[in-house]
Amino acid sequence: MRRLAVIAALGLALLGSVTAQADEAAGHYNLALQYKREGNTSAAIGECETAVKLRPDYAAAHFTLGNLYRAQGDYARAAGEYEKTVKLQPKDADAHTNLGAAYARLKRSDEAIRELETALDLKPDDYEAQLSLGFAYKQQGDYKHAIEHLQKATELQPDNPQGWANLGVAKSKTDDKEGAIVALKKAIALKSEDADLHFDLAVVYRRQKNTDAAIAEYQVAVQKNPKFAKAYYDLGMMYSQQRKNPEARAAFEKYLEYGSHEDAGYRKDAEERLKAFKGTASSDGQVAHAK
């Protein structure tokens, strides 16, 4: 009897310890949520990390920690937390969606597609899952399936520019350039200050050989983002085609001012074109002097 009493006492003590640890984990998690609402991401991460150390099976804390890492652009750590979440809660559609989106950001498109298809099996009308699945297919160059899911995303949230933007870019990779223009214009109507949208539309016009329309959109892109290096480079190329050398020279100079040194090919080309412009100007000056 005494032995049974000792075992029972130990069991109650262990249960009490586990309960206390779970309560402590919940306290840290609730504090993490408060920090998150206040915009203090680093403090929120610290509290979430403490919560999952105290209670490794705390699915909600793993999911929130994944979201916090994702907000910082740390998709590898985010994916790790979402992986733990789906193991603990395999029927959680949002966890599969966020894991798939993180995989897509990490260019693990096969795994992204698997997770996002699972998410849509659980929750067919989920905008984020449709959008991310379209993005993952676009990464693979499967524009047919990308367009299918991105089109669905725009139907679910027609006032969200992200769906239209991705749909436009996907269609621009096919023969449906007019469809791409329509989609990108809808995105711009919803978010006119986004320089990237104007750049994407300019690229479509350029592929159509609609030089004037392309230049107009590139100009808007650099107005919205005065340090948009690639837009300046493309502008320089378009002006060169029109033999507008002063405008081309100014655009290439802006590209060299703001462009990354990692883009060695573009930098070398811009530098060589500027040298050619200077040589032309020098020759023109000599001819004028001779006259």
Regions of interest found by a model, annotated:
Residues 37-50, 71-84, 106-118, 128, ...:
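Structural signature of tandem alpha-helical TPR/SEL1-like repeats
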Residues 24-26, 59-60, 93-94, 127-128, ...:
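Helix-start (N-cap) detector for alpha-helical repeat units in TPR-like alpha-solenoids
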Residues 25-26, 241-291:
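Terminal, low-structured helical/coil segments at or just beyond the last alpha-helical repeat
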Residues 54, 88, 122, 156, ...:
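Structural marker of alpha-solenoid helical repeat scaffolds
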Residues 18-49, 53-55, 59, 64, ...:
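N-terminal leader/linker segments that initiate helical-solenoid repeat arrays
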Residues 7-16:
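Bacterial N-terminal signal peptides
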